[in-house]
């Protein structure tokens, strides 16, 4: 099972929310009703909606995947641990497992392989939109998730997954593909990536689809 953090690098846009499936394990507040119906996915074209630049070095991604992918832990816990591993190897997490905002800002400027437009987009998504989401968490979703993930704190991984959704919503015109499917997903994500409650609704839909 690939992780959200790896999918950012491969631009597998329709699957960037998989790690956020974690929130459906918790009892959240009331979501936006629009988030209960998810657009369809064209598996042949799901990677072509947005050309996302490289966010993390391949050697870091590969090292963390190799370290955790073969473990017998549940897939979601492995996803959480792989993402946290990548962030730690890039020195983006403090000793208390919180994301280091100052280092994130420097990292984006120095390490993200993209245009200034992309760097501005990444900084806004991570620092202004997704980290505040984790800080607010009115339904205490994160604290409820911790018991399901061993010793892996979900907040850093969920921050990255949330940011990935924002990248696709706000993908620069030169890097985006216009198609009915891509436009529908961009509209959906623009409405449903703004609260943990909405993200919860998305993954309840995903789980219902898996059981059919």
Swiss-Prot record:
SUPFAM superfamilies: Insect pheromone/odorant-binding proteins. Residues 1-28 form the signal peptide. Disulfide bonds join 64-85, 80-152, 130-162. The keyword rRNA-binding does not apply. Coiled coil: none annotated. GO terms for biological process: sensory perception of smell. Keywords: Disulfide bond, Olfaction, Secreted, Sensory transduction, Signal, Transport. Gene3D superfamilies: 1.10.238.270. It holds the Pfam family OBP47_like. One of its GO terms (cellular component) is extracellular region. The keyword DNA-binding does not apply. It is found in: Secreted. PANTHER family: GH25962P-RELATED, ODORANT-BINDING PROTEIN 59A-RELATED. Belongs to the PBP/GOBP family. Present in the aqueous fluid surrounding olfactory sensory dendrites and are thought to aid in the capture and transport of hydrophobic odorants into and through this fluid. This is General odorant-binding protein 66. It comes from Anopheles gambiae (African malaria mosquito). The gene is Obp66.
């Amino acid at each position: 099972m690939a992780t959200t953090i790896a999918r950012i690098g491969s631009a597998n846009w329709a699957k960037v929310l998989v790690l956020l499936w974690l929130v459906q394990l918790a009892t959240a507040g009331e979501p936006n009703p629009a988030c209960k119906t998810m657009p369809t996915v064209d598996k042949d074209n799901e990677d072509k909606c947005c050309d996302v630049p490289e966010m993390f070095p391949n050697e870091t991604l590969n090292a963390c995947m190799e370290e955790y992918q073969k473990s017998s832990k549940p897939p979601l816990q492995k996803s959480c641990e792989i993402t946290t591993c990548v962030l730690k190897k890039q020195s983006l997490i403090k000793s208390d497992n919180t994301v280091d905002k100052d280092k994130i800002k420097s990292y984006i400027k120095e390490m993200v392989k993209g245009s200034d437009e992309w760097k501005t987009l990444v900084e806004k998504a991570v620092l202004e939109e997704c980290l505040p989401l984790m800080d607010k968490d009115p339904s205490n979703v994160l604290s409820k998730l911790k018991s399901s993930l061993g010793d892996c704190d979900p907040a850093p991984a969920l921050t990255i997954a949330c940011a990935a959704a924002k990248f696709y919503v706000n993908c620069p015109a030169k890097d985006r593909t216009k198609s009915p499917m891509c436009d529908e997903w961009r509209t959906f994500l623009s409405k449903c990536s703004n609260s943990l409650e909405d993200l919860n609704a998305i993954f309840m839909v995903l789980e219902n689809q898996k059981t059919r």
